[in-house]
Amino acid sequence: MTSVNAVLLGLVQAAGEFLPISSSAHLVLMPWLLGMEYQGLTYDIFLHLATLIAVLIYFRKEWFTIIKDGLTKPKTEEGKILWLLVLGTIPAAICGVLFEDWIETVFRSPFVIAAALIVFAVILHLADKRAGQKDVALNVKTVLIIGCAQALALMPGVSRSGITITAALFLGFSRAESAKISFLLSTPIIAGAAVLKLKDINPADINAAFIAGFLTAAIFGWLFIKFLMNYVQKHNFNIFVVYRIALGVIIIITALMK
């Protein structure tokens, strides 16, 4: 793998992980569209570790408080957040352990990915209209709904950030609250997935290109988080809806022409 390819894949991972456009769809489609070979599990793990570092650094103050309060005063409203986030991770974790390999095999078709991009873009658009319409809080019910929605992101094209933001918007959270919940909920699931796969890392695969991709994913991951958190303060999610639909249409046309 060249350094250019590594940087490109790192950039795609960073954008797709934190923007509601589906990193898995882009990483699956790039080899198909551009003729790039699959870079292997070691590189996938490196990219996920990079995005984990990005979200931990950006929300370092929040996570410090969440963990401290969760361990020292778990019965308070502040202390419950840690355990709610853990609870919200369970549905996706269970589905990932049981069905990830099957899902990645069955749903890697370009047509399926395109359909997921388009269908869930429309759902995001509908949810966006409900942003901030209710006085809602993070509790067992809301976090389980968002957590169950997160499990759908195992299918390429759905988007983990997209589906969790969509679920939060449908519940009545504001756009900024929905994005923050999505990012906080992503931390344990990304960490868990990376830790489970660490044993599969082949040190012989690690080279300068891998490091370049890792740094790209970490740096741009942080930048994309910052961008989205600022963007949703004044804008809706329509730009991502349009992008997803356009990409889905392009994929379908390209697949039919091949």
Curated annotation (Swiss-Prot):
Protein's name in the database: Undecaprenyl-diphosphatase
Its membrane topology: Multi-pass membrane protein
Designated gene of the protein: uppP
UniProt keywords, alphabetically: Antibiotic resistance, Cell membrane, Cell shape, Cell wall biogenesis/degradation, Hydrolase, Membrane, Peptidoglycan synthesis, Transmembrane, Transmembrane helix
An example molecular function term from Gene Ontology annotations: undecaprenyl-diphosphatase activity
Function as written in the Swiss-Prot or TrEMBL entry: Catalyzes the dephosphorylation of undecaprenyl diphosphate (UPP). Confers resistance to bacitracin.
Species for this entry: Elusimicrobium minutum (strain Pei191)
Any Pfam family matching the protein: BacA
Catalytic activity: di-trans,octa-cis-undecaprenyl diphosphate + H2O = di-trans,octa-cis-undecaprenyl phosphate + phosphate + H(+)
